[in-house]
């Protein structure tokens, strides 16, 4: 097993008397963008929490760079993986610049000014720097959370490690959806960052993911390229939706249409 991987082996998780994740095995590697899709209640957020170390499986294990997640200290793990949650509250009246600066806590004692300026620019947050975080719109807050996640993982020339995102586009308009996913895709091309994000929009997953993981009732129903996973037969069976899949002539990307 390569030390540069995050490897999950036979993960199981139960809560409230229900099995939420059952027998999931997968590998995440730097240099790729992975989309986690599936219907409501499939277990996507639970799996993300298991992969990022926020939950412990009742069976199976996750290994990051050859070591079980359970043996990493919180400080060590904070330098190697970051999580952008759907929502997060800030209890006090902090400005955006102050909120983003908090993400550099794992790197205390190292210069942060250049890093913060870089991530604020990349995420389009520089014009928000002096505003109070709690006063921002939902979409603006999502962009700030992305800036925080990138700041947490930023090393000499860019982010390194594993970045997990739970529905990062849910509050964004079309322009900012494209900008966020395009940025994540470009950052992974350097080969030092692995991105795993939950997406409800399967067309966004088709457009930007190198690999798609399709989760159904806590099990991994399919894993592969967008063309391999996003087939009519597979999507109809999983989502129970009346849909069509066509391939874009321009770039060969599958495009999913709902029928009336």
Curated annotation (Swiss-Prot):
One of its GO terms (molecular function) is ATP binding. GO terms for cellular component: plasma membrane. It is a peripheral membrane protein. It is found in: Cell inner membrane. Residues 6-242 form the ABC transporter domain. It comes from the Bacteria. Its EC number is 7.6.2.-. It is an enzyme of class 7 (translocase). ATP binds at residues 38-45. It holds the Pfam family ABC_tran. Keywords: ATP-binding, Cell inner membrane, Cell membrane, Membrane, Nucleotide-binding, Translocase, Transport. Belongs to the ABC transporter superfamily. Heme (hemin) importer (TC 3.A.1.14.5) family. Part of the ABC transporter complex HmuTUV involved in hemin import. Responsible for energy coupling to the transport system. The complex is composed of two ATP-binding proteins (HmuV), two transmembrane proteins (HmuU) and a solute-binding protein (HmuT). This is Hemin import ATP-binding protein HmuV. It comes from Sodalis glossinidius (strain morsitans).
């Amino acid at each position: 097993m390569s030390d540069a991987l995050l490897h999950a082996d036979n993960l199981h998780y139960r809560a409230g008397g229900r099995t939420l994740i059952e027998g999931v095995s997968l590998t995440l590697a730097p240099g790729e963008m992975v989309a986690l899709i599936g219907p409501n209640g499939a277990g996507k957020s639970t799996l993300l929490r298991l992969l990022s170390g926020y939950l412990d499986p009742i069976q199976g294990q996750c290994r990051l760079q050859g070591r079980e997640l359970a043996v990493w200290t919180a400080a060590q793990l904070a330098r190697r993986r970051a999580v952008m949650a759907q929502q997060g509250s800030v209890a006090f009246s902090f400005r955006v610049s102050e909120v983003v600066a908090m993400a550099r806590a794992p790197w205390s004692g190292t210069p942060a000014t250049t890093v913060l300026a870089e991530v604020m620019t990349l995420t389009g947050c520089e014009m928000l720097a002096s505003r109070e975080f709690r006063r921002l719109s939902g979409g603006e807050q999502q962009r700030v959370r992305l800036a925080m996640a990138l700041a947490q993982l930023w090393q000499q020339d860019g982010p390194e490690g594993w970045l997990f995102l739970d529905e990062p586009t849910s509050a964004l308009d079309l322009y900012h959806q494209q900008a966020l996913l395009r940025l994540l895709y470009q950052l992974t091309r350097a080969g030092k960052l692995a991105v795993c994000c939950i997406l409800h929009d399967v067309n966004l997953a088709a457009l930007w993911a190198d690999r798609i993981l399709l989760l159904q009732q806590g099990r991994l129903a399919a894993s592969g390229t967008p063309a391999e996973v996003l087939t009519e037969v597979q999507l109809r069976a999983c989502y129970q939706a009346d849909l069509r899949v066509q391939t874009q002539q321009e770039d060969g990307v599958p495009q999913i249409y709902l029928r009336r």
